[in-house]
Structure formats: structure tokens, C-alpha cells
Amino acid sequence: MADEKSPTRISPHLIAASRSEMRNNMKFRPCIDIHNGKVKQVVGSSIKDEGNIAKENFVSEKGAEYYANLYKVRNLSGGHIILLNHKDSEYYEATKEQALLALNAYKGGMQIGGGINADNAREFLDAGASHVIVTSYVFSDSRLNYDNLERIYKAVGKERLVLDLSCRKKNDKYYIVTDRWQRFTDEIVNEEFMHKLAGYCDEFLIHAVDVEGKNNGIERELVKILGGFDEIPITYAGGVKSLEDIEILKKYSDGRLDFTIGSSLDLFGGRISFEEIADKY
């Protein structure tokens, strides 16, 4: 493993000042989750590579391109496309094909994650992704792998890299999980760790995996931790089931966090109006 190091970074004071101006201006970040070649909403903690299994909340009859076009028409940028199949899965190519169709439909409008590394990242950027989202590649062997972090940083640059710090709670702390949220690492999400990574990436994406897809409300403790961090934008995903949850998210994060809604959105069989969210946020 390489020595711990960090690229040249903008003054944290300037970044914090910029982020402070964004308070109370939370932004809705739409999503397209693709599993077994279909747009789906799944329970995050249920995903199993073996057998390509996941507990499904919603399976769309429409392709990923439909949703990308919808987000484009509503000028909703900065959303993410997630490939939920492992590269060795028999369904991976079908899932990837759907993702590429979505990127082509909304060039520069969406980020993409799922199996991204320094060798294939450029393919997805060239296909139209604004950013690549990376987790497992930089958290190999249960720890932060600085060699791989440097490789992806050099391959795409800070401005086009999103680090996914999706996490699950264990022993009262939030540990980053990898491999489609199946494997715990030894890295804990806290302000110190996020500060260490902020110089490498443009944003963080963080799914609260324990509540992802369960419609039980947001992970408030995690939101408090994330809301205390000012250096780069953070998108929170997991458990938003109502407009009230968005207000709670705003309160607990002081309006700093952007957010994603999945299975609770009427686009995906839920009750929250997509049109209302798109208009308001």
C-alpha cells in the first residue's frame, strides 16, 4: 500500500464558505438503479451476487433511457446510475447496456457507478457520464487502498470523481461497505475520514444501507455526521419516505445535504410525487 498522501487541495476555508452559501438549498438528485438488465428499486441490504438475488420493491417496464430523458426534460442534473450486478454476472452486459443508453440520452447529466476502476472509467465518461462513482476499487481488502485511489484520481481527475461512502451501522459506528453493500470494511464514516478523501474527489455519495429501500425513514445519526461536513457536496440516499423526512433531513443537516428518493417516489411505485419534488428541489 502506498504512503498516505493527498493531492494539492483548495483551502478548506474557501470550500467551507462556498458550501455555507448552499445551505437551505438542498437539491434533489434522481437515480436509476439497474439490476439484471432492469430498472429496479431494491432493498439495499438484500443484494446477493450469488444467484443475482435482491429483494425487489419495484421493477420497471420501462428502460433506463426513459428515466434519463425524464430527468433531462426536468433539468435534474447530478443524479446517479448504479449497476447492481457484478462483472462476472450473466446479467452484467444487459445491465451495462441499459446504463449506456441512459448516459447517451442525458449526456453530462448523470453520474455512474458499479464496477468502476481506473481501467474502465474513461469508457463511461466518454459515453456521457458527468462523473464516475467508485467504492470497491478504492476500498479493497477492507481498507482504503491509496494506490488505487491515486490511480483513479489520475485517470479521471478530481472534478469527475465521486467517492461512494455508503455505510452500515455496527457497534454504534457507520462502516463503509463494498461489493454491492455486502462486505464491511474497517473504515468508519466520520469528519476526519471525509476530510482525508475530499481532496481527491468532487463529491461524496452515501447510501444509508440499513434503511435503503425499506421506507422506514432516514438514518438520523448518520445525517448529523454528514451535515457537519462542509468541504465538498454530499448526496444522501436511504429511507426517505415522505416530504416530512426531507424536512427532517434539512433540519438535521442544516440544509447541507442533497438527497435521493428511490422506492418512495411515484415513478417507482411509491407515494411521493416526482413532479412535486422536481418543482420544489
Pin down the residues of each PLM region.
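N-terminal active-site wall of soluble small-molecule enzyme domains
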Residues: 73, 77-109, 115-123
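Glycine-rich, proline-tolerant flexible connector loops at the mouths of alpha/beta enzymes
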Residues: 78-94, 136-142, 207-215
